Amino acid sequence: MPVSPIWPAGSAVNAEGEITFHGRTAESLLDEFGSPLYVIDTDEVRDRATKFVHSAANAFNNTVTHVSFAGKALLSKEICRIVTESGMLIDTCSMGEMRIALAAGVPGRRLVLHGNNKSDAEIELAIEQGFNKIVVDEPGEPERIATIAKRLGKRARVMLRVTSGIHAGGHEFVSTAHEDQKFGVALLPAGADAGKLAVLDDLTDVTPAGSNARLGENASSADGSDHSAHAERKLQYDVKYPYDLSHEKVSEGDRRLAEAMTMVADGPALAVLKDIYRRQDVLELVGVHSHIGSNIHDADAFIQAAKRMMLLRKTFLSLIHISEPTRRVVIS
């Protein structure tokens, strides 16, 4: 008979009441391999990895998606092969994990380096092997990565990890989203009024293509005109909008959004993005990343965190456009 759904599909309980894995009893496995013993159902790993990859692609079918396997969960050469064959990248956070993945034949373009205490040797290996990205976890890292990349004559792909202040479930002791925890760079400056981000609740149209978050129709302009008139603005104007508050069609909602953007502009995360941008000869900024917690079923938390990341993205692009209006910048 089958066991609880939490067990792999290949698990069952036989007539004698013994747990079996693909027909092999647990006792026979212990007799052959000894104890303690980890038993991994590779069919289950492959099936789950494939489902995650396909689900992400289907949910966000208007953009490119990457799903990463956290190497810290369990990393062996065979696991590396299975998850990458299923379409996943692999997150590594130590020299050992990096070496295991590379020994399994995983190319650098399928690997990511995480960690809040990276050694120079780990950064150097990631750059040499052309890792998909190095996730910047603290303000001093861009300078270190840039120095090593310059010495190697290469350009490193980097992504910034941001603590968004949104936490999706899980125990407080293992939370990775709060502003005062050890991973990532805070979105807001210390003591900032996070209540100003309530303007994000009114956003109705957030698209990867334009990245211009729109306020709902309830936000009427100062002169009483329909807010939908903003849709007629050309992209060049929109990129710095709503900082240009002198525009005749600026609404109260625009002003609230500008206030939120100004607060983000004063935050640590934006400062690090600007530092990376200044080093673009050796650093390629490929995106921002926020880990909000362990409860993957908390859809509202993911939506709120995504809105905050879009606000950071919009603020960064606005500042770059104002300072260098002719330069085109792409950030995912």
Could you say what each language-model-derived stretch is?
Residues 157-160, 164-188, 237-238, 242-244, ...:
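Phosphate/diphosphate-binding glycine-rich loops and adjacent basic-rich segments that engage nucleotide
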Residues 307-314:
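Midchain, well-structured core segments that form catalytic/ion-binding scaffolds
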Residues 238, 246, 267-278, 290:
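Conserved beta-alpha junction segments in alpha/beta enzyme cores
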Residues 70, 157-163, 289-291:
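Short beta-strand segments
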Residues 1-157, 172, 193-207, 212-215, ...:
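A charged N-terminal "starter" segment
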Residues 59-62, 268-285, 315-319:
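A structural motif corresponding to the C-terminal end of an alpha-helix
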Residues 320-325, 329-332:
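Single conserved hydrophobic/aromatic residue that forms the stacking wall/gate
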Residues 297-305:
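Short glycine/threonine-rich loop-to-helix capping motif typified by GTGT followed
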